[in-house]
């Protein structure tokens, strides 16, 4: 579970890349995220913006299985979430 302080910290983390995949559904949310991470360098941070509720659970779990670090998952709108991922 992400605490309020961690949520506040996530707003201060500057992402190297932003992937806006609102409108996409699973499994495409993970596929797009994985492809974007493959383009990035180790240690860089990706902010993924999604609006497909099942992806809020599935994308973080899948990228962690790939070895990346999920820094935060935060609801940023009525039906939008921001996921911060640090590439392994």
Swiss-Prot record:
Q: Which InterPro entries match?
A: TusA-like, TusA-like_sf
Q: Which Pfam families match?
A: TusA
Active-site residues per Swiss-Prot or TrEMBL entry: 26 (cysteine persulfide intermediate)
Source domain of life is Archaea
> Which PANTHER family does the UniProt entry name for this protein?
SULFUR CARRIER PROTEIN YEDF-RELATED
Q: Which family does it belong to?
A: Belongs to the sulfur carrier protein TusA family.
Q: What is this protein called?
A: Putative sulfur carrier protein AF_0554
* Organism annotation: Archaeoglobus fulgidus (strain ATCC 49558 / DSM 4304 / JCM 9628 / NBRC 100126 / VC-16)
